[in-house]
Amino acid sequence: APPQPSDNFIRF
C-alpha cells in the first residue's frame, strides 16, 4: 500500500 499521510506523520 502507498504511504499515507498518517504514516508520513509518524516518520516525523
Curated annotation (Swiss-Prot):
Principal location: secreted
Name of the protein this chain belongs to: FMRFamide-18
UniProt similarity note: Belongs to the FARP (FMRFamide related peptide) family.
Gene Ontology annotations of biological process type: neuropeptide signaling pathway
Primary role: Has modulatory actions at skeletal neuromuscular junctions.
Originating organism: Sarcophaga bullata
Domain of life the protein comes from: Eukaryota
Residues carrying Phenylalanine amide: F12
